[in-house]
């Protein structure tokens, strides 16, 4: 019996270590509401990586039908959106989602979300870590504020 418990503890220890890995830090999350009702909203944020590389594999919200992650690529001088399954979060580095670059496309956003309100977003990482925070909802014509990477404290 004691031997079985000891073996079980040894087998479960790596899983517990993975589950307790620190999550990347997400900050400056905001959502640009669509100018036309029924169109997708855009989502933007800054992620700071931990000591180990990770990957953002999805974002969800109870206030949206679905959320896609997109990159912008230059194909023959024409900028095109491309849906992505994941984005690398470098160890001790940063991943930025900003207007004109990487961004979220938020489909079926709840119509009661108004400028000045918030939208809960859950960020899922390849490591199994999840980070939930409230993103500020901004009007389609609101000025863009750049994220401040220097403001992050390790």
Question: Where are the regions a protein language model picked out?
Answer:
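Compact, glycine-rich, soluble single-domain proteins
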Residues: 21-154
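N-terminal signal peptide c-region/cleavage motif recognized by signal peptidases
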Residues: 12-16
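Bacterial N-terminal signal peptides that target proteins for export
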Residues: 1-9
